[in-house]
């Protein structure tokens, strides 16, 4: 089963992201295809994507997440600045003010999961929340002109109280996430 470890963003940040998406949509042709918006209610901060794992591995994963969570105190992170990956943009996202504690949390999870036999993250952690994925070159060029107008946007703060393990199922209508476990920070 496709599995990932994430932080929930909370209702306020999700609502603000939904408003931001609507603002950006206002600059695009309403009939525009070639862009897939992420449902704000499904938006999360991914700490580690594990990919396909066997069901008998879930207990080990959740044990690592539980042990890691108990070593960290609750903290907050700011969600701000719209940006993108790719030229023209292929993924539009809003950034996370990556704090030392968030980096240590992600690094500790990655290290412990790597020791348990999962693949290490090769890329440096870039905390972000995906707003949309772009499939069409022309839409990407349009977004490239629009994004700078939203660089000062702030969606508020995520109050990090727990770490979650999710199962992800890809469907024709989009991904469906099932919470497998949640562990409170100390």
Model-found features: residue ranges?
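Histidine-dependent nucleotide/RNA phosphoesterase domain, centered on the 2H-phosphoesterase fold
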Residues: 1-186
């Amino acid at each position: 089963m496709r599995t990932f470890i994430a932080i929930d963003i909370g209702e306020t940040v999700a609502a603000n992201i939904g408003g931001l998406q609507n603002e950006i949509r206002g600059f695009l042709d309403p009939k525009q295809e070639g862009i897939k918006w992420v449902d704000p209610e499904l938006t999360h901060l991914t700490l580690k994507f594990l990919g396909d794992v066997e069901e008998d591995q879930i207990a080990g994963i959740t044990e690592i997440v539980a042990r890691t969570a108990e070593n960290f105190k609750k903290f907050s992170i700011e969600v701000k600045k719209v940006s993108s990956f790719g030229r023209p943009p292929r993924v539009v996202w809003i950034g996370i003010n990556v704090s030392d504690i968030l980096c240590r949390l992600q690094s500790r999870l990655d290290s412990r999961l790597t020791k348990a036999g999962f693949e290490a993250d090769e890329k440096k952690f870039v905390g972000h929340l995906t707003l949309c994925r772009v499939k069409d070159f022309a839409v990407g060029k349009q977004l490239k002109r629009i994004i700078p107008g939203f660089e000062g946007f702030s969606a508020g703060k995520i109050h990090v109280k727990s770490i979650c393990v999710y199962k992800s199922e890809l469907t024709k209508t989009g991904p469906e996430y099932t919470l497998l476990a949640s562990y409170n920070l100390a």
